[in-house]
Structure formats: structure tokens, C-alpha cells
């Protein structure tokens, strides 16, 4: 033991060190354990349990992101609906379904109902311009096999039948509304999923050190020296690892910098907090069973897309509305108010300044959102639930998101990215994940990409096993309707998503 991180003794040697006990590390750990059972793994988590930050079910919307209802994945370009991003995200979510199904068949995952449940996905349009867009979006997707049984209606009676809670008190004569929907959607509890993975990992011999914060990563010969602080005793310990994965959410960028990963030079992070309104009133819950996504206001960022969601957590249904944007300098929900200021360095200050100059719309959105009180938030809720009673709803703080700011040439100098960015060094012995949505939903696809980048020499040897995990590996399901249908039926059954 040592009270100084610089003199911390190396007390263990492992093949793989996983930093952060969220869904990212859980997934990569499960993959590597199956591919190389003899490789030792160790997990470090600064909190006292798994999946307590972004993976926690009330810290995210739990949407199984497959672009069935999220309108920002089907932008309009030159008068046409571009579905390429929707197809890409849908394809990756099918990889998730296959991987989870395989883990259930292997007994690694044990209870699908604890982490995934069928919930219809609905797109909601208000006003003639949005309704026209939604109809054209529906026309662009309806015949694609990746979007099964999608339907559209601008009929008031159908709206009332499908969305009774959203119909109460609504004046259908004052504004045109329309919906498109599919019963192929899901609600996912990524916290429960991560916990099942880590339970299996611990049983297989993986050491999980909760209450340990990794404070330094340095190269020592052919290995990485990973130094962790025991947050309960204040002592420091070090381990040697051949491969390091940094799945530390908003703290990933700083750790990759400490490791000397040149690929993050110039990168910065923009923290965005959020709030939800939550209701557990059974009278409301029984009147709404869907994830309903609307369209962001003109000029507003993608993160501002409002949605009214059914959540299934620990077997209990609840309703979540939001997110309402907020701002905090923290890079984790349980982080420090100094996080943002500590992240500013000579190599990324121009990236920060460039984004500050460009993103007026984002700044205006965040300022407006921060100034909203509870009553103002309920007013926004009433666009979806006109009869909303403030007494039925409570405020819940969402997980902290850190959007990636990539360096760019003049005159921008910095580019704000909405999505997930995988980083690795040229040697492929350290990797990390930056960014936010739709990360959790497509984690298996991200980790397959990581394996290809960092363990390329092993991929031929691992090929058959990866094909077992993900039967469609190497094939684009968007180009193979027969295989898509086979995989859909297989995962529907294994994940217990079939209607009864």
C-alpha cells in the first residue's frame, strides 16, 4: 500500500484492465472472456457498485435505439428523407440483440425480462409541416424489412386509441397531429444488463474493485501501469495490464490523456446535464404504453428531442418525460465541479473556443432550459400530456453526458460531435470510448469494432466464435432480408419479446 500514486506498488498483473463498471466494460469483458477464457481481467469502479452512472436505468431513457421512432436519425436533405443513419443504427442494434441472445443461451445472462421488454416505438408530429415530414419519413421506411410493420395515421380516432394519455384534454381541432408506430420497439434497462454481466464475470474469476478510482495510466515496458486509489482508505495500488479499456464515461478523455494516447490530442469535452419528469402514478402508467419521440424545435440540438417513455425497471412500469437540458461543469453525475476547468489544456483550448463561437443555438437552448422552473417544465410536458397534473410528476436528475469536441482546421477550430467515438492507440493496447447516445444500445457493435482495431491478429482465430456470438457478423442485414428475418425470429424468442 502507498499514500502516493507515484510510489504505488505493483501488486497484480492481468491481461485486461477494464476501467468503469458500466455497460461498455461489461460487454467487452464478456466478449474477451468467451474468446480467451485464460486471459485474466480486472475491473476498477470509483463508485461502490456496478452501473451507477450513465448505465443506471433512471439516468437514461432506456430506449433500445434502433431508429424506429427517433426522428433525428432521418434528417431531411434537399427535400428527401435520408434513412442511411437510421439503417446504420438499426443494423447495430440487431447486433446487440444477437449478442444478448447468445449470452442468454450460454447462461451468462439469466433473466431477459429484467433488462429488455417490448414497448411500441412511436413518432409524434404536431402541425402541418411536421405531419408532412412524418408521412414522407413513413413512406421512406415502410417497405424496408429493417422496419417491420410500421404504420402511420393522421386520424384523431387512431391517435386516441393508441395514445389515450396523450389524448386527454387535447384539442384536435386546433392543431393537426399524426403518429407513426411499430410494435418492434423495446425498453432496455442497461443497469440490470450490466449487473448480470458482472455477476457472471465475478463467478468466472474476474476481480472487481469497487470504490477504486483509476488516477494514472503510464506505459512501463510492454505493459501499462494502472494506478488506482482506494476511495475508502486513501491508499494507492498499481497493477500491470497488457491491454486497457477506458470505459469511464466523462472521465475517459482525461485518463486517455494521462496514458499519453496521442489520438486524443486537441479533443475536448462539453458536459451537458439533464432532467426528467417522472410519474409512477398507476392511473397514468396504465394509460400509456409506448416510447413517443417528437421532433426537436428548429435550430435546437439533437439532445433536445422530447419524448414520453414507458420505463420498465425492476418489473415496475413508470413514465419518464424529457430530457430537459441543463448545464454543469461536472463530467460525471457524481463528479467534481472542477472537471471542465481541469480539462482545458493548451492543445484543446482552440477547440473549446471554436465550438463556443459556432454553437449559438446550443448555448441559447441550454440557457433557456436552465432558467425553466418546475411549472415551466410541466408546460412543456403538456404538449404531450395536455391533462398533466403537476402533483403526479417529480423531477429526476439524468445522467451526465459529455459530448465530444473534435479539433478542426480554421475557421472552425473545433467540431461538436453528437454520438459515440471509439479511440485507440496505433499499437492497439489501449482504447477508450468518448461521447454519448446511442452508445449503450449499440455497445456490442462498438466492441466488435474495438476487437477488429486492437486485436486484428486474433480475428481469424476468433472468427468462428464471433460468428457464434453474432450470427450475422460479416453480413449487412440491410442487404439480406432472409437473414434479417431469421435473426429477428431467433432474438424475439430468446429475449422473450414475442407477443402472447
Curated annotation (Swiss-Prot):
Keyword match Flavoprotein: yes
One MF term in the entry's GO annotations: L-malate dehydrogenase (quinone) activity
Alphabetical keyword list: FAD, Flavoprotein, Oxidoreductase, Tricarboxylic acid cycle
E.C. no: 1.1.5.4
Claim: Metal-binding is one of the keywords in the record: no
A Pfam family of this chain: Mqo
Pathway(s): Carbohydrate metabolism; tricarboxylic acid cycle; oxaloacetate from (S)-malate (quinone route): step 1/1
Cofactor(s) needed by this chain: FAD
Known catalytic reactions: (S)-malate + a quinone = a quinol + oxaloacetate
Swiss-Prot/TrEMBL GO biological process terms: tricarboxylic acid cycle
Similarity comment text for this entry: Belongs to the MQO family.
Record-linked HAMAP family: MQO (MF_00212)
Name of the featured protein: Probable malate:quinone oxidoreductase
Amino acid at each position: 500500500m502507498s499514500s502516493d500514486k507515484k510510489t504505488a506498488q505493483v501488486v497484480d498483473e492481468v491481461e485486461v484492465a477494464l476501467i468503469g463498471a458500466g455497460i461498455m466494460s461489461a460487454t467487452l469483458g464478456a466478449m474477451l472472456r468467451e474468446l480467451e477464457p485464460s486471459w485474466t481481467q480486472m475491473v476498477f469502479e470509483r463508485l461502490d457498485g456496478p452501473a451507477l452512472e450513465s448505465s443506471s436505468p433512471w439516468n437514461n431513457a432506456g430506449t433500445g435505439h434502433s431508429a424506429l421512432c427517433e426522428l433525428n436519425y432521418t434528417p431531411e436533405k434537399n427535400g428527401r428523407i435520408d434513412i442511411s443513419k437510421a439503417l446504420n443504427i438499426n443494423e447495430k442494434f440487431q447486433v446487440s440483440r444477437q449478442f444478448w441472445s447468445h449470452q442468454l443461451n450460454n447462461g451468462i445472462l439469466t433473466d431477459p425480462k429484467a433488462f429488455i421488454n417490448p414497448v411500441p416505438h412511436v413518432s409524434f408530429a404536431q402541425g402541418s409541416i411536421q405531419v408532412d415530414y412524418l408521412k414522407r419519413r413513413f413512406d421512406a421506411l415502410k417497405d424496408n424489412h429493417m422496419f417491420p410493420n410500421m404504420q402511420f395515421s393522421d386520424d384523431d380516432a387512431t391517435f386516441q386509441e393508441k395514445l389515450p394519455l396523450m389524448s386527454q384534454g387535447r384539442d384536435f381541432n386546433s392543431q393537426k397531429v399524426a403518429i407513426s408506430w411499430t410494435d418492434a420497439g423495446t425498453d432496455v434497462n442497461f443497469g440490470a444488463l450490466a449487473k448480470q454481466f458482472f455477476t457472471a464475470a465475478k463467478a468466472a474469476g474476474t476481480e472487481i474493485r469497487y470504490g477504486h478510482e483509476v488516477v494514472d495510466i503510464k506505459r512501463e515496458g510492454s505493459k501499462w501501469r494502472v494506478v488506482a486509489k482506494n476511495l475508502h482508505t486513501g491508499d494507492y495500488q498499481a497493477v500491470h495490464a497488457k491491454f486497457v479499456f477506458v470505459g469511464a464515461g466523462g472521465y475517459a478523455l482525461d485518463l486517455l490523456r494521462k496514458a499519453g494516447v496521442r489520438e486524443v490530442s486537441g479533443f475536448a469535452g462539453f458536459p451537458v446535464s439533464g432532467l426528467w419528469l417522472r410519474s409512477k402514478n398507476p392511473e397514468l402508467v396504465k394509460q400509456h404504453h409506448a416510447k413517443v419521440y417528437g421532433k426537436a424545435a428548429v435550430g435546437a440540438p439533437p439532445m433536445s428531442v422530447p419524448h414520453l417513455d414507458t420505463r420498465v425497471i425492476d418489473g415496475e412500469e413508470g413514465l419518464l418525460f424529457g430530457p430537459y437540458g441543463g448545464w454543469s461543469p461536472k463530467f460525471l453525475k457524481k463528479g467534481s465541479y472542477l472537471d471542465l476547468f481541469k480539462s482545458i489544456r493548451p492543445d484543446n483550448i482552440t477547440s473549446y473556443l471554436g465550438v463556443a463561437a459556432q454553437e449559438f443555438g446550443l448555448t441559447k437552448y441550454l440557457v433557456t432550459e436552465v432558467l425553466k422552473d418546475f411549472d415551466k417544465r410541466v408546460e412543456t410536458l403538456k404538449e404531450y400530456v395536455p391533462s398533466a397534473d403537476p402533483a403526479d410528476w417529480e423531477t429526476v436528475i439524468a445522467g451526465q453526458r459529455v459530448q465530444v469536441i473534435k479539433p478542426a482546421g480554421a475557421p472552425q477550430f473545433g467540431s461538436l460531435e453528437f454520438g459515440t467515438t471509439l479511440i485507440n492507440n496505433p499499437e492497439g493496447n489501449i482504447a477508450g470510448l468518448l461521447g454519448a447516445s446511442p452508445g449503450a444500445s449499440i455497445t456490442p457493435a462498438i466492441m466488435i469494432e474495438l476487437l477488429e482495431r486492437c486485436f486484428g491478429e486474433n480475428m481469424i482465430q476468433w472468427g468462428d466464435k464471433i460468428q457464434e456470438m453474432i450470427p450475422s457478423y460479416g453480413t449487412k442485414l440491410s442487404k439480406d432480408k432472409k437473414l434479417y428475418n431469421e435473426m429477428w425470429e431467433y432474438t424475439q424468442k430468446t429475449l422473450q419479446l414475442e407477443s402472447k
